[in-house]
């Protein structure tokens, strides 16, 4: 692994499925090197997570919310690219000391090999009824008067019914 590590600058709205936490994983799967238990076309999820999401998606649609996954499974290599990109930005563009840059990055992102996205159980979602914008996962977009506030309130009330927990 490279000595530098970078993360996404925008915030993650992570959701994790409890059901998968009871499953045993191989080390390669745990750290994002290899995962064969994934389903989906362009967006990959662990099979139980996928099925739970589909149920939640149907329920949300009945309430006028169009759940759209903007990030799901990503392997070690993709996480490393993200980490390195953020690290470069913080140290080269913002001129942060390496330790300070890392501390800033880990506020919202994880070091490659430690991301729950490696498991295919975490998803970042938005309400697809609203046009995509830059940095869709910023906290303020999920707060009162934010474009995804209705989604946040719906998830607060309903996500655990489907085995998802906001993080």
Predicted feature descriptions by range:
Residues 1-26:
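Bacterial Sec-dependent N-terminal signal peptides
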């Amino acid at each position: 692994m490279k000595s530098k590590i970078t993360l996404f600058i925008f915030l993650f709205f992570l959701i994790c499925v409890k059901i998968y936490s009871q499953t045993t994983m191989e080390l390669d799967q745990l750290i994002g090197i290899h995962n064969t238990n994934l389903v989906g076309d362009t967006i990959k999820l662990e099979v139980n997570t996928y099925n739970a999401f589909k149920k939640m998606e149907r329920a949300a649609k009945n309430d006028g919310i169009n759940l759209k996954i903007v990030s799901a499974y990503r392997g070690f290599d993709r996480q490393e690219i993200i980490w390195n990109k953020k690290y470069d930005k913080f140290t080269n563009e913002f001129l942060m000391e390496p330790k300070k840059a890392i501390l800033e990055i880990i506020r919202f992102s994880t070091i490659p090999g430690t991301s729950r996205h490696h498991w295919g159980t975490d998803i970042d979602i938005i309400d697809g009824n609203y046009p995509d914008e830059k940095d869709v996962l910023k906290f303020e977009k999920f707060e009162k008067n934010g474009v995804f506030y209705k989604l946040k309130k719906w998830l607060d009330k309903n996500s655990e019914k489907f085995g998802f927990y906001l993080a």
